[in-house]
Structures are given as C-alpha cells and as structure tokens.
Amino acid sequence: MAHWVKGNPVDISNGVHVVEFWATWCPPCRTSIPHLTQIQQQYKDRGVNIIGISNEDLGTVEPFVTRMGSKMNYTVAIDEGRSTSKGYMGKYGVNGIPHAFVVKDGAVVWHGHPMAKLEAAIDDALK
C-alpha cells in the first residue's frame, strides 16, 4: 500500500479480514460505507479488520475520509499502481466496484458485493 489513510497497516496473513475495493466517485461504494462501518463494529472484538482500498490519489481520498468521519470507521489505504487491486480483482476476473474479499489466514475464502452476504461469509471464515 502506498498510504494508510486511516488506521494502521494490517497484516492479512493471519486471521480474518475484509479487503474492499472502492472509489470516492462511485455511488454504490459510498452507499456501502456505513454498512462496512457497522460490520467493523460488529466483528472488531473477534479480530476482523475491514480494509477499504482505493486506487485514487491521496489528495482525493484523504479529504473524503476526513469528511466521512465516524461514518467510515475502518482502515483505509491507497493502492497506487493498482498492484493489490490487480492481485485480487484480476485473479478473480472482477472489474466492478465496490467488491469485497473475505481473507482468512492470507487466502481468499469469499468475494462479492459488500452489501450481499458479507456477514455470512465472515461468520463462515470465523468458524
């Protein structure tokens, strides 16, 4: 990651994490932000981290995250050069955003729209 805009760097090689690709200009992405904040709150005591990743520049993402405040209460990072995005989205043939990946111990165990069955996928990964 080029920049960790909100929160500390996360090591996804251990535990359960949600890696979600989004953009400030994307209305469905903005709609899913409060839902992801709710999920982060719901699962934080079980060690789950939500990581929102954008490939936009710091000058675009940072003010957006600041304006969102507590409505966007999870880790946010910038993927300059799209290497992380290509590693996830490209591998699974996904082009559209928002798109979330549930990662358990470094391996993707589910992927889909963050508003569709994400909680069930997290619950399964935590078993």
Predicted region positions:
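Active-site-proximal beta-strand/loop segments in catalytic clefts of secreted hydrolases
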Residues: 21-23, 53-56, 79-81, 112-114
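Structural microenvironment flanking redox-active thiols in thiol-disulfide oxidoreductases
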Residues: 31-70, 81-89
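Short pre-active-site segment immediately N-terminal to redox-active cysteine/selenocysteine motifs
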Residues: 14-17, 22-25, 57, 96
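Thiol/disulfide oxidoreductase modules built on the thioredoxin-like
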Residues: 68-72, 79-125
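Active-site acidic short loop of glycosyltransferases
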Residues: 13-15, 45, 71, 94
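Hydrophobic beta-strand anchors of alpha/beta hydrolase catalytic cores
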Residues: 18-19, 50, 100
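C-type cytochrome heme c attachment motif
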Residues: 24-31, 99
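A short beta-strand-turn-helix
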Residues: 1-17, 86
